[in-house]
Amino acid sequence: MTLRDWFLTAQERANPRSELPVWTDGNLAEPLIHGAAYFDRLVSEVESLTAGDHLFFTDWRGDPDERMRPDGPTVAQLFAQAAQRGVIVKGLIWRSHLDTLSYSEEENRDLSEAIRAAGGEVLLDQRVRRGGSHHQKLVVLRRPGEPRRDVAFAGGIDLCHSRRDDAGHAGDPQPIGMSPRYGPTPPWHDVQLAVRGPVVGALDTTFRERWTDPMPLDSENPMAYLRDRLRGSDLRPDPLPEQPADPPPCGPHHVQVLRTYPAVRPRYSFAPDGERTVARGYTKAVRRARRLIYLEDQYLWSTEVAELFAQALHEHPDLHLVAVVPRHPDVDGRLALPPNMVGREQALSLCHRAAPERVHVFDVENHDGTPVYVHAKVCVVDDVWASVGSDNFNRRSWTHDSELSCAVLDDTRDERAPADLAGLGDGARVFARDLRLRLWREHLDRDPGGAQDDDLLDPADAVAAITAAAEELDRWHAGGRAGPRPPGRLRPHRPERLPWRTRLWALPAYRLVYDPDGRPLRARRAGTW
């Protein structure tokens, strides 16, 4: 296996204006499954920072009062106390749509002001396409005097309400409003990646490119500009400290940072035509798949994305697609619900038509039977290539919003049979296989130490095992829940097909508002990313 077989080359990245490396070697990547694990680790790392260290972060939503541990501190307390110790705290939070539209305008502003009052600088950033968002979830911690301790976190977990859940999936005691089908404290499944080594420098560069971009923070929003002027908001980022050298190599993982930036006017200085390495990176990896693609995704929308999977399934008769998605959208209502449903129904239908016996889609519930909201954005291909990020499998994430993902290739082979799933000589890799197995052990109620992994290694056996467990749990529910609950938390996912009258308006609303296209016109016409 060569890294170029899986990772994008500089030419394939197609963004020469960015200073981001093509990929980095010698890293150590660790998946942190669930918000409780991530928040606990983040508290430990931030509390160890001292004067002159760097704390940079980007976020889609930030709730200042979200408790990082059961007894605190809150997000605002953790970052404000760091600033008070002399840590250089800088943040970019999306300037959200109005709270009246079920977004987080006021929460993001409150977090910004709380950290600013302590000596940090957190800016509300609206340098996106109209109707778009900054969806990256990143924290970079640099210690210029001790670079070996530098660490960064990237993935799907925001610093906000509803995220501090664990494997028990009782939900976060501080919930956000969601569909009532998820209960008063919605169970939440998510993944964040902790990385050390030279990739921390690449993620630092990602933050710095956005921070130093000369485009106005409230671009194309005169109302936001007026409100900011009246409130005395910080609209001009202060200079950042000099970027430290990359941390030294520390592990066997090659990491490629993948991003989405839309084509906008004025242009991003670091991505004049936008950047779509998320879409290109997934496309390259999926086209190399031969036996198993495993996804966890919040949406799994878009016919353009589904066509990629459908083509792979058509070309490779031994390939299986296994996906774990939410049972219900996070919203309810006569107007909001149908556009959320129609995109997934279209995408899954396209995949099923390509290979009806080899597409396996599940949703998750906790042991009380409450559905778990799947917010994770994870992809594992043939137990070789794996990614964790902020991006969903839809056109919005691949073209329209800002997104950030880390793809990982491990030098360390996993010698358990089958040692080479695809037969291409790549060989199963420890990081990718362990990530898939950790997730499946939880979903199937298997031994977390791996003692019950034997039927989860070979793709055909694994698909049979996961399907049998989901069907058995389904039968238990259908039978009135009589007798002991079978092990496992997965149920077969059955998307509801909307009536044709509803589809008439839901489909255009979905394509124009919920899943828009941020590509330049020439890329749209060519059907390329």
Please name every model-derived segment.
Residues 1-529:
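Charged, low-complexity intrinsically disordered terminal segments
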